[in-house]
Amino acid sequence: MRWTKSSQPRKQRKAFFNAPLHKRQKLMSATLHPELRKKFNRRSLPVRRGDMVRIMRGDFKGHEGEVVEVDLKRLRIYVEGATIERANGEKVYYPIHPSNVMIIEPNLDDPMRRKIIERSGGTPEVEAVPEKSEEEKEEKEKEEEKSEE
């Protein structure tokens, strides 16, 4: 996302770090599931609280959960179930960058969000994306067993 006419990396970084909230919201985009891409006729959507996402990278790779919080200041999201334990035993959400998740079931309660999808030529009615097939689950279990050895 380019805000300034300058091509100097220094000024691009400054614009990025000092971006206002309405521009930070655009930076919080995540890719859509391939089935949703066809249905919505777009590649990505900004992440919102209530979206169901699948984590694609990092320690929680493969985990699916609902977005609990979107932190625009730190450009991170918090997903239900992706928690770590502090030294005192308290469970806290692990911050995840939205580029590392895939939206599998968007929250379409907001009429403005529906309009965004309609504008791009998609249909905003959505059913849940089917779960991973049994074969994929078995392959994942085998990979986990190999990594434990």
Curated annotation (Swiss-Prot):
Example GO BP: translation
Listed GO CC annotations: large ribosomal subunit
UniProt-listed Gene3D superfamilies: 2.30.30.30
SUPFAM superfamilies: Translation proteins SH3-like domain (SSF50104)
UniProt biased composition (Basic and acidic residues): 129-149
Region Disordered: start-end pairs: 114-149
Pfam family, one: Ribosomal_L26
Any one Gene Ontology molecular-function term assigned to this protein's record: structural constituent of ribosome
Organism superkingdom: Archaea
Keyword field: Ribonucleoprotein, Ribosomal protein, RNA-binding, rRNA-binding
InterPro entries: KOW, Rib_uL2_dom2, Ribosomal_uL24_CS, Ribosomal_uL24_euk/arc, Ribosomal_uL24_KOW, Translation_prot_SH3-like_sf
Similarity comment: family membership: Belongs to the universal ribosomal protein uL24 family.
Subunit structure: Part of the 50S ribosomal subunit.
Function of the molecule: One of two assembly initiator proteins, it binds directly to the 5'-end of the 23S rRNA, where it nucleates assembly of the 50S subunit.
HAMAP family on file: Ribosomal_uL24_A
PANTHER family according to UniProt: 60S RIBOSOMAL PROTEIN L26 FAMILY MEMBER
Protein name: Large ribosomal subunit protein uL24
Organism: Methanopyrus kandleri (strain AV19 / DSM 6324 / JCM 9639 / NBRC 100938)
